Amino acid sequence: MCLTRFLACLGPTEVVKVAGVLLAAGSGSRFAGPSHKLLAGIGGEAVVTHAARSMVNSGLSGYLLVAGATELSSALTEFSELVIVENPESEHGIATTLSVAVDWGEAAGFDALIVGLADQPGVLSSSWRRFSNSYAPIAVSNYDG
């Protein structure tokens, strides 16, 4: 597989088909709450619901959530445009989850993927949009730094 197909570096005059991806396949083993961390409540909604809403409201061309260790679909019913794919090898680490996302992106004809983590509910839709307009082969976010 050629990963260069996913580089969003075509420049501002090119139309690039960009998908947002939330990685949500981990076991959340360090979280001490009564449920999986992605199902923990913030303001009456699951963490994963907040993260998915932000991504889906960003205006990208497509949206994927890669699940694995726990059932998340009940927290995502409002997002008809969100594709949910299971990573059957999630216990082998985040690289396998990213590989599932890249395979999906390639099969669906996307030019670039913006990858986020489903346990980061504070990422804004505007942040997803900014990344889609970066025209850089690799873009990394930072906070207060």
Feature map (PLM): residue ranges:
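Nucleotide and nucleotide-moiety/phosphate-recognizing core
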Residues: 17-145
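N-proximal low-complexity "stem/linker" segments adjacent to membrane-targeting elements
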Residues: 2, 6-21, 28
